[in-house]
Amino acid sequence: MNAQESRYEKARKLGARALQLAHGAPVLIETEHTQPILIAAEEYDAGVLPFTVNRSD
């Protein structure tokens, strides 16, 4: 998690990516995990999640 990202934003990213993976999206990293949420967490840690957060202040 970067310094400006809240835990809610992280949770939203991980949940969205896990849903994509559960529906058959390709995995972006090499991993031994088979559960979508664990794969999403590894992708997040590797910095390869295909999401950005646009805040409207």
From Swiss-Prot:
It is found in: Cytoplasm. GO terms for biological process: transcription by RNA polymerase I; transcription by RNA polymerase II; tRNA transcription by RNA polymerase III. Its EC number is 2.7.7.6. The keyword Cytoplasm applies. Disulfide bonds: none annotated. One of its GO terms (molecular function) is DNA binding. Pfam families: RNA_pol_Rpb6. Keywords: Cytoplasm, DNA-directed RNA polymerase, Nucleotidyltransferase, Transcription, Transferase. It is an enzyme of class 2 (transferase). InterPro entries: DNA-dir_RNA_polK_14-18kDa_CS (IPR020708), Pol_omega/Rpo6/RPB6 (IPR006110), RPB6/omega-like_sf (IPR036161), Rpo6/Rpb6 (IPR006111). GO terms for cellular component: cytoplasm; DNA-directed RNA polymerase complex. Belongs to the archaeal Rpo6/eukaryotic RPB6 RNA polymerase subunit family. DNA-dependent RNA polymerase (RNAP) catalyzes the transcription of DNA into RNA using the four ribonucleoside triphosphates as substrates. Part of the RNA polymerase complex. HAMAP family: RNApol_arch_Rpo6. This is DNA-directed RNA polymerase subunit Rpo6. It comes from Haloarcula marismortui (strain ATCC 43049 / DSM 3752 / JCM 8966 / VKM B-1809) (Halobacterium marismortui).
